[in-house]
């Protein structure tokens, strides 16, 4: 086995080349140079190569030998497995056979590569010579290095020693300089402290330099300055305390000089930011304690509880007897709390103003920049947010734990809101006047530089930041109580209405009941007047109240047929409608009076209520509209009966100057007088009635003139009677108007048309009232009465009745449509004359054509 192992080592492949099974099976041809022996060996290798290759393949394919080819082959593991798997004798025989085959193969390989192996052996001898030479030279190099080391070590050690000595000397010199400076500054500090507050900023500057000298070095154990260090520590504490007192005094008295001096001290000491933070945090903590104390129900009930000593577990809730005193005590505490918030806000705001104006005289750095340089917000924004959050949280906890406080906050919310508004106004006034106080007290003493800055107007109570509303942040703490108050306010407004409109009721509220509703509305608006937004919110509640009243009243209105009859006396439904309208009118007038009596009433709130009152007015109009329609229809029916009378008669020869009016006119006058006395006089809203009856009067006048222009034939006697009717028409519609002249264009047309009855056609066509006062269509229709029967009126040509023609005119209010209808009648007349081969037209025809052309051109 040893020989085999040696053969395997000798036949190893050269470095860098890995041998494979193919190399062993098919060895490279041997070098043919070197004599016959070599040739013989080569021939032997050639003859045995085929058998050797087959032998190797058999070994590789044999499962008994495959384990020996694995990279992780372990002898112990293989031996253990062989003992357990097969007979040991068979395994040994198998292994011996394999070893024998490998020996033969190795022998063949050595014989085949004899020359190569000899060359390798020669190369090993040459390599040993080279290695021996290298070893000699390495020894020489090591000796040279040792000689150089002996020359360098001693100077190096000296340099290290001198360097350490120099460093210690420098440290000693630095320490001595610090000690000397500390001694000098300590001596100067003693003099500055003796100067009192006038030298306090210089003392702070000296302390700041002393702190700088003490940084990064341990000065303990140095006897020469031990007393000075103790003095410096006491001096720093004294300066800090003195500066704090100066700052507190300056903030309390609003003295910018004192505040500026104190801030300069803290800036020199390097504690400006920490001091400001501590001061603001202290104010916030104090305010939170005051809020908690003001809302502490135990503190509020303490005076009343001290008289009667309660036993264990006795509740601190107020008794009915002391509720008034407790409520008064609570609101007194709230007023004191607002005063304290105002005082603290003034101090913090004053502090921020000084910080914004004060600059260090050496570096010229503004103090406010030192505070906000790390991206922090301005101190007053931080403080104000803390105040508003404290109010919100403390109010929430207090009202959750005490039903009395909850009722006080919700029931008397306007009073609480007034305190807030007063606080806000005081803070705004302070903001507007603080700059004047600065200018009045501004000096250059103690380096207090109170110069003007561009952002003087930047103030939290004079908001200029669109993303922050400080007033809203303050009032947000009251949001839950405002919602509860508005809900209760709406209930207070709705309750009296629901009470006076019981289910199944048929009558509107009485005057006393309506007065109660108005008083409730006035009371709610008066209480809400403390704040614009609250007034607007309550006004919306009032608008809802008016809408509820309107809905309840509408349910009482009678819409049956008897509600619009004008034949007999008032029916029950009409009486109820009149009562509802009167009730709505009283509500409308009373609410309008309440709104007008409010001082500084917001326009938006007024518009909200006015919009609701418009619904009341619309309901009143809807309630009387059926009656008005019936009255208008009856008047039209009476006027249209004028065509049943004869106006073709000539002038009477009796010589009586007085011509009686027509029967229809007497009937119309009687009807209008009866309507006013039987129906409209029961309405208490005269202006509302006249606003509606004036429209009926205008319609009546227009209908009268329309039908008067259609009368054919019209004799001289008929003209006199029709003129009398015109005069009586003014008297007939008089009850419907405050003054007949208020009818406007209808009244002017009535007055202008009457003289045309007696004028010649040429004068009628040239009347100045034509076009502006009296429409062309009315005048041309009137001229038809002066034409022969052959010239038919438009309604006669269409074979319409007077009623149908009047309806057509109502359906076609356009003057152009009416003129086109008239033109058709004139054209039909021309055709009839030509068809009978007439020689001339009626004298009035050219005048009518001229007027028609003038009217059409005026429309264009």
UniProtKB/Swiss-Prot annotation:
Coiled coil: none
Cellular-component GO terms for this entry: cytosol; Golgi apparatus; Golgi membrane; Golgi transport complex; membrane; nucleoplasm; trans-Golgi network membrane
UniProt topology in membrane: Peripheral membrane protein
Residues of the signal peptide: none
Top-level taxon in the UniProt lineage: Eukaryota
A single BP term in Gene Ontology: Golgi organization
Pfam family, one: COG5_C
Chief place of localization: cytoplasm
Annotated localization: Cytoplasm, Cytosol; Golgi apparatus membrane
Alphabetized UniProt keyword annotations: Congenital disorder of glycosylation, Cytoplasm, Golgi apparatus, Membrane, Phosphoprotein, Protein transport, Transport
Region (Disordered), start-end ranges: 1-33
Associated disease: Congenital disorder of glycosylation 2I: A multisystem disorder caused by a defect in glycoprotein biosynthesis and characterized by under-glycosylated serum glycoproteins. Congenital disorders of glycosylation result in a wide variety of clinical features, such as defects in the nervous system development, psychomotor retardation, dysmorphic features, hypotonia, coagulation disorders, and immunodeficiency. The broad spectrum of features reflects the critical role of N-glycoproteins during embryonic development, differentiation, and maintenance of cell functions.
Function field: Required for normal Golgi function.
Subunit structure: Component of the conserved oligomeric Golgi complex which is composed of eight different subunits and is required for normal Golgi morphology and localization.
Similarity section: Belongs to the COG5 family.
Protein name: Conserved oligomeric Golgi complex subunit 5
Name of the gene: COG5
